[in-house]
């Protein structure tokens, strides 16, 4: 295995690990505990399954922590293609990671309130709004990521195009959720297809790695 392919696989595996932690907090936990527009039922579920909810908080923190290493691995893989764009990806991660950690603190705050029922939806909605706001920054991560993949020649160009579309999709989701929340679910339904680009790149990196001969051909 070449050093380039090894770097790609490390990045892919870390990407998968971070995504798994994210799915636990953003998909699995809400499906088990959160009841839309029902603060009483949501509060009861959280109190009845406090360990599960706390596990979701830990998963969210781990997702954010592992993402730092994902970004560093991607930087190592792609800096030779375009260092300014690769640095921009690192800068965005440095900016966005503290936001995730602060957002996790909002979840912890639920357990500190005497009137949990009155505050639970407030903090969960605040968590969601911060997630939406942070998605505005993802376009500044995924568009450079997509451009680097497209130019690399050792990764499929279609993945580069797809990742650029992922960045645009995150931006549209963020703007819709913040300004037109009634349409958020509709936009999310269509955006899911585009966001599968992240699944595609992480699986390609982890399974296929990178083709170093393509890099050699492009620099000759």
Where are these regions (language model features)?
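Hydrophobic, aromatic-enriched alpha-helical segments typical of multi-pass transmembrane helices
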Residues: 1-220
């Amino acid at each position: 295995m070449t050093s380039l392919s090894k770097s790609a696989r490390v990045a892919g595996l870390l990407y998968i690990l971070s995504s798994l932690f994210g799915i636990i907090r953003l998909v699995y936990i809400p499906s088990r505990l959160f009841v839309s527009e029902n603060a009483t039922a949501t509060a009861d579920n959280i109190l009845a399954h406090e360990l599960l909810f706390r596990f979701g908080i830990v998963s969210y923190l781990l997702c954010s922590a592992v993402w730092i290493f994902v970004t560093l691995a991607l930087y190592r893989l792609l800096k030779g293609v375009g260092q300014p764009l690769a640095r921009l990806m690192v800068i965005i991660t440095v900016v966005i990671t503290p936001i995730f950690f602060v957002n996790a603190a909002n979840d912890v705050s639920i357990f500190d309130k005497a009137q949990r029922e009155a505050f639970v939806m407030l903090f969960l909605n605040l968590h969601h709004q911060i997630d939406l706001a942070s998605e505005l920054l993802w376009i500044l991560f995924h568009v450079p990521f997509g451009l680097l993949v497209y130019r690399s020649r050792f990764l499929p160009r279609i993945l580069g195009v797809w990742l650029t579309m992922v960045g645009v999709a995150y931006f549209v989701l963020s703007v819709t959720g913040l300004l037109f929340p009634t349409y958020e679910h509709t936009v999310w339904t269509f955006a899911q297809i585009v966001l599968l680009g992240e699944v595609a790149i992480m699986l390609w990196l982890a399974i296929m790695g990178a083709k170093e001969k393509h890099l050699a051909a492009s620099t000759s």
